[in-house]
Amino acid sequence: MASVSYQKPTSTTVGKQMIFTGPDYIKDYLPKIHQHTSYVGEQHLALEKTGDLRYLWRPASNRSLPAKYKHEYVSEIGWRIPQYNFINKSRLGSGFHIKYEELSQASLDSITHRYQNPWQPKPHVLDMQGKQSRASFAWHMSAFEDTDQRNSKWAILVRQCKSSLPRASKPPKLPKLPKKEKKRKH
């Protein structure tokens, strides 16, 4: 028998699922809170200029509620910091923080509507695919998803079907109704 040896992982995050990763894609992203935010800039502040952020972030003078910081809003920078988590608990449970843009919503729709598609190919196309094609149609729906595109595999097959079928096997057309003749007045 082969011997199995156990090796400790190189990191605590190896083999675990990560939802938010840092810029290096190696470990979970941990936000940092900057303690001294009274001044932001590269050089020292000139005495005559106003750059004190406490002055800029002061509450309104009419005793209204203070404006919320950016980290207090869901899905903003720093919103999952444990110190401010009391704001986010209800939003996290509802899934409100997940924002779907146009492309991600389209991809979700294509996945969730895969087995709800009412379209089916015509019977002669299924017959050309061989035995058991009708029975396995629901399990191979992804092969039929792009039939509306011009160069998909099955669109080409349907085009070849239409051009190569003899006239007798094409579905019959309904006869045209005779046109009514107008009566002439003498």
From Swiss-Prot:
A Pfam family the protein falls into: DUF4562
InterPro entries (UniProt xref): DUF4562 (IPR027814)
Region spans: Disordered: 163-186
Positions in coiled-coil regions: none
Basic residues: bias regions: 176-186
PANTHER family attached to this UniProt entry: GENE, 17359-RELATED (PTHR34833:SF1)
UniProt protein name: Protein SPMIP2
Source organism: Homo sapiens
GN (gene name): SPMIP2
